[in-house]
Design a protein with these regions (language model features):
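A short LG(V/I)-centered, amphipathic sequence patch enriched
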Residues: 16, 42-61
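Central regulatory/effector-binding core of bacterial HTH transcription factors
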Residues: 92-153, 223
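Beta-alpha-beta core module
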Residues: 156-162, 167, 227-281
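Short beta-strand-centered segments that line the small-molecule binding cleft or hinge
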Residues: 2, 87, 110-114, 132-169, ...
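A late-sequence structural motif
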Residues: 107, 257-306, 313
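Secondary-structure junction motif
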Residues: 149, 179-180, 193-215, 244-245, ...
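Hydrophobic hinge/microswitch elements
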Residues: 130-135, 139-142, 149, 201-259, ...
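Short helix-boundary/capping micro-motifs
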Residues: 12-33
Length: 315
């Protein structure tokens, strides 16, 4: 059986696009050349890899097995080439990692800015998503690491977690909001207004259940983009959340007001972030990945990153 990496890349594109036309475009090939490549791969393995009788061209059982191995092989080959280039002093490899929405709106872009200043020839690809999807893509070897909530990975020996500093988050509203001038408010008063947040972080879900007394509590507006959520808060009576790591609050320019809630103690663990860097224990990080992680951790430890907090905002 003879299989080359180019054919595997083509099959991955077909599996992702579910179309010979779109798959060919994704790898910059003519449709006829792309089809011949898939057919040659099927001839090498001795069986069909996609069900051509289905409109979505779903992989056959053999195709699913090949796809799983193909992704690992292609990812491993890319990582090998990157590491060799980096060790040769070219510093021109590619880095692929993921990030949760909150770190992606401040901490991580700042770290990338420092990183590309030191490695101007490097190519950085980072994907913003929730921790569940980031975990899946890490397992599929699309990423070397990701930055997100670490609670679900700290006790798993398959992962290495490097914790970042815990940061306090708060409920907040626009400066002209009816609750803006209050020293503190009750949970009932807070929840009488629309809530615009993401509820994926487990600590936030815990607080919302605590305040509402409902396991199925759902916000009025749910989104993974901190900038979009804050636009909703600044243009309505909706309540949002705010805290460190994000540059959203710098752009608010004093228009955000922090809300103290009677039922929430300041030392409550759920009111603090638990972000960190998650990687696979069985996979060695490339030099560029290690360098990026160093920049993220250094920025997290530095005093200048604290400008992302709420100290300069109305309280």
């Amino acid at each position: 059986m003879h299989i080359d990496l180019r054919q595997l890349r083509h099959f991955i594109a077909l599996a992702e696009q579910r179309s010979f036309v779109a798959g060919a475009q994704a790898v910059n090939l003519s449709q006829s050349a792309f089809s011949r490549s898939i057919q040659a791969l099927e001839h090498s393995v001795g069986c069909p890899l996609v069900d051509r009788g289905r409109k979505d061209l779903a992989p056959t059982k053999q195709g699913q097995v090949l796809l799983e191995h193909a992704r690992r092989l292609v990812s491993g080959a890319r990582q090998m080439a990157n590491e060799i280039n980096q060790f040769n002093g070219l510093e021109a490899g590619e880095l692929h990692f993921g990030c949760g929405p909150a770190p992606a709106s401040g901490l991580v872009p700042r770290a990338i800015g420092r990183f590309i200043g030191r490695y101007p020839k490097a190519r950085v690809h980072f994907q913003v998503d929730d921790w569940q999807r980031l975990s899946k893509r890490l397992q599929d070897e699309e990423f070397e690491f990701f930055v997100a909530d670490t609670r679900n990975f700290e006790a798993d020996p398959a992962y290495i977690t490097q914790r970042l500093r815990p940061r306090r988050w708060h409920f907040c509203c626009r400066a002209g909001h009816p609750l803006a001038g209050r020293h503190s408010v009750s949970a009932a008063e807070l929840l009488s207004y629309p809530l615009a947040v993401t509820i994926r972080p487990p600590n936030l879900r815990k607080v919302l259940v605590q305040l509402s007394g409902r396991l199925d509590y759902a916000p009025n507006v749910e989104c993974e983009s901190p900038f979009s959520l804050m636009s909703v808060v600044l243009s309505s009576d909706a309540i949002g959340i705010c805290g460190a790591y994000s540059d959203v609050f710098l752009y608010a320019k004093g228009d955000l007001v922090r809300i103290a809630v009677d039922e929430l103690a300041d030392d409550q663990d759920a009111l603090y972030t638990r972000y960190g860097i998650v990687s696979r224990a069985a996979v060695r990080l490339s030099p560029l990945a290690q360098a990026m992680i160093e920049q993220i951790k250094a920025l997290d430890d530095s005093d200048d990153h604290d400008v992302c907090g709420l100290e300069n905002f109305a309280i």
